[in-house]
Amino acid sequence: MKSFKTISTLFAVAIIATGLSSCDKTDYPDRFHATDGVPTVYSIRYANSDTFIEQAFMEEVVCILGENLRSVHEIWFNDQQAILNTSYITDNTLLVQVPKTMPVVTTDKIYLKTTSEETVEYSFRVLPPAPRVQRISFEYAEDGQEVIIYGNYFYQKSDSPLKIEFPNADAGTIADEDITLTSVKVKVPAGAQSGKIKISTASGTSASEFVFRDDRGLLFDFDGTNGLYTANKGWHAASLSDGGIGGSQCLMLDGSGESFTADGSDWHDGSCHFEYWAGNWQDPETYGTWDGRRLNDIVDFTNFGSMVLKFEVKIPEDHPWTGCPMQIIFSDVTLVSNGSAGVKDIYGNTLAGCNNTYFNDASISLPRYIWRPWADGMIHTSGEWVTVSFPISDFSSFWDGSPATGKLTKESFANLELFFAAGSTSEGSPCSPIVYIDNIRAVPAK
């Protein structure tokens, strides 16, 4: 594959303005005059180089060399029209930026059209940028399990097939029908290990923003193997189920016996409320037991603004989630803790103790994420595990869905609650969902 050099439009303009000779040695006329006849194309170069090229990336600036180029009225790359600027057209040179939109039909040709509707074709390939590998349908998929990788600029050609490399394993040949511009379907190859997935196209190779089978930042795995396993560290005892990932335990928020209103105006405690409040009813509080620690002692939240909260979720088709949002709330021990109010901890903090007022107290206006998956088209997962991700920078809503006025700090990540309530208008519909959750973790966004 040829070596490419990307330049910005502004740089290209600067090249023309300073009269660099790599594209044209003739001064630009004071005024553009269109000509009759048809153009002739001899070759194409980069605007700042004498290197001849037969292909370029989207949004790159190229210089067409030929004759009678003032006759060009329109220029198309495949089926995408480029923008012409007559200030950068002479009889022998035409400077143009390759369109940034993927073609619907790829012909690998440039079409130069005149005002008399005559068209001249020239063979030239437009390449998308290197692929962007943003997320995967299920980060903990087992070998042989089918997953979907999402991103952009996925494509393959007969002479340059798309390749997917899992850590320690190659996914092999990918069928054309399993590839779209923004997704690719693939089976996890045998022997795949934890790490970043790489995807290669004719445009280059990129590593995933996520880590496959990520073992970093684990807060709760609900079986105590690598993370906390409790489902009861507050006032309410959510259930644990044996149907977790890999046959382990997972959290079960069981609304099958409830009737959730669409807007969440009636909150649901008991089996539909997960609380983890740090502390062990000690005085002073030491957070000394495995399941009493502050979450920010387990994971470093110093750079929380560039982190994401992730977990796997499974929603049965016969108990869909069609309304009533979930509040995802981190909090400091000075707002709520597992113990008595007024007790100090070994760090000098005065603890708030157990309470159910901090999360809807307007004077605190604690930021949180309000999750409405049905609004994005997900009311169930067909009983399969999928990975969901919430940028902590998006934790910005108050209890009722309005913008929160409070601020999060690294100390705000001691506790976690998942709570079906409020935060919505009348969108959605009443429901009795069952929501399984596993592997709650906080990791860098990239």
Which residues make up each language-model segment?
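Extracellular carbohydrate recognition and processing domains
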Residues: 344-406
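Beta-strand acidic-aromatic groove motif in beta-rich domains, primarily in extracellular
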Residues: 318-344
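Extracellular beta-strand ligand-recognition surfaces/modules
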Residues: 311, 325-327, 331, 385-434
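C-terminal motif of bacterial Sec signal peptides marking the signal peptidase cleavage site
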Residues: 18-22
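Beta-strand/beta-sandwich contexts
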Residues: 24-70, 117-159, 194, 203-221
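Extra-cytoplasmic beta-strand recognition segments
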Residues: 222-224, 295-326, 390, 440
